[in-house]
């Protein structure tokens, strides 16, 4: 039998799924959500079994990489068991997870044993007070302990994700690179994404491009362009002074990666988002609940949904919000 694959209307193969397991988070990062964020009632959220069933259908259709996200995925009860189920799906090559690191101290080893291959950990500052300001509730020491616990558990190629904001943490770029070098971690610098209406700061004023980040790094290190890929949006560079780590740049504004987009997102409400920067979506939860025990109905809906995937997003570097859902509702 020939391999089943998902192809969108622009002949791009879609084999990477980002699945949100919760919209809830123990942080309130200023670029991600409002401080008084109202979370979804439980009846609107997919059950763990439904998340697993959706993962089964996507893998049956050729998905090779799944990343679990949130909110903060590790605060959802039962998430380690879910990881073990998904990691065991025949045909899935890689199960990854993005976390703020707050729960890794106790969950890194169970996640590794469950079959999670790689972790991305958000870290925007190495200054405890600034970290608290940017996350509103976060404890820097707890996150660093979690990163060290992940290394001790056996995780390799753990990656730090840093959202760079002008006047907030841009002066810490090289300190974060040095932190990554010392702990043998990859690191990606991310341009702030205009999702959700915020009042805490002006996105136009806080924008700091990937080019500016590279220029800042080049003041201390020698950058070497790399053709490496992790099947995601990061474009990688190496450092002559520390060739064992990778530096990634995720640049939705300045160098968008739409032309080679291979991914879709599933919200914890069961909506399949065809693009991070558009509202095109399909309600897979409705299909799943209307046709229990009929995976073929779900797979048909997924295949049809690929026709709705746009060629590119519509992000702009200003304060005009094209997408009103916050990042935690999208699946970060």
Curated annotation (Swiss-Prot):
Binding-site list for S-adenosyl-L-methionine: 31, 71, 122, 193
Positions contributing to [4Fe-4S] cluster 1 binding: 25, 29, 32
Sequence positions that bind [4Fe-4S] cluster 2: 258, 261, 275
Pathway(s) served: Cofactor biosynthesis; molybdopterin biosynthesis
Record protein name field: GTP 3',8-cyclase
EC number: 4.1.99.22
Subunit structure: Monomer and homodimer.
UniProt remark on cofactor binding: Binds 2 [4Fe-4S] clusters. Binds 1 [4Fe-4S] cluster coordinated with 3 cysteines and an exchangeable S-adenosyl-L-methionine and 1 [4Fe-4S] cluster coordinated with 3 cysteines and the GTP-derived substrate.
């Amino acid at each position: 039998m020939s391999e089943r694959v998902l192809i969108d209307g622009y002949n791009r193969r879609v084999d990477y799924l980002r699945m949100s397991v919760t919209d809830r988070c123990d942080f309130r990062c200023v670029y991600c959500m409002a401080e008084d964020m109202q979370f979804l009632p439980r009846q609107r959220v997919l059950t763990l079994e439904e998340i697993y069933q959706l993962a089964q259908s996507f893998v049956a259709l050729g998905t090779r990489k799944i990343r679990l996200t949130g909110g903060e995925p590790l605060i959802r009860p039962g998430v380690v068991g879910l990881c073990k189920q998904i990691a065991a799906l025949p045909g899935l090559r890689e199960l990854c997870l993005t976390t703020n690191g707050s729960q890794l101290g106790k969950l890194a080893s169970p996640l590794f044993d469950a079959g999670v291959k790689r972790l991305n950990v958000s870290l925007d500052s190495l200054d405890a007070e600034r970290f608290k300001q940017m996350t509103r509730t976060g404890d820097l020491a707890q996150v660093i302990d979690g990163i060290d616990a992940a290394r001790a558990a056996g995780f390799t190629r753990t990656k730090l994700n840093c959202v760079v904001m002008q006047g907030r943490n841009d002066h810490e770029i090289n300190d974060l690179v040095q932190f990554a070098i010392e702990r043998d971690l990859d690191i990606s610098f991310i341009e702030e994404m205009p999702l959700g209406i915020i009042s805490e700061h002006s996105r136009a004023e806080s924008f700091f491009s990937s080019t500016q980040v590279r220029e800042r790094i080049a003041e201390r290190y020698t950058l070497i362009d790399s053709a490496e890929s992790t099947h995601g949006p990061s474009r990688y560079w190496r450092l002559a002074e520390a060739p064992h780590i990778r530096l990634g740049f995720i640049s939705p504004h300045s160098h968008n990666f739409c032309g080679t987009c291979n991914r879709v997102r599933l919200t914890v409400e069961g909506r399949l988002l065809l693009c991070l920067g558009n509202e095109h979506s399909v309600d897979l939860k409705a299909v799943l609940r209307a046709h229990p025990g009929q995976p073929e109905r779900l797979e048909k809906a997924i295949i049809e949904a690929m026709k709705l995937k746009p060629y590119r997003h519509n992000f702009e570097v200003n304060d005009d919000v094209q997408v009103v859902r916050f990042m935690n509702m999208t699946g970060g």
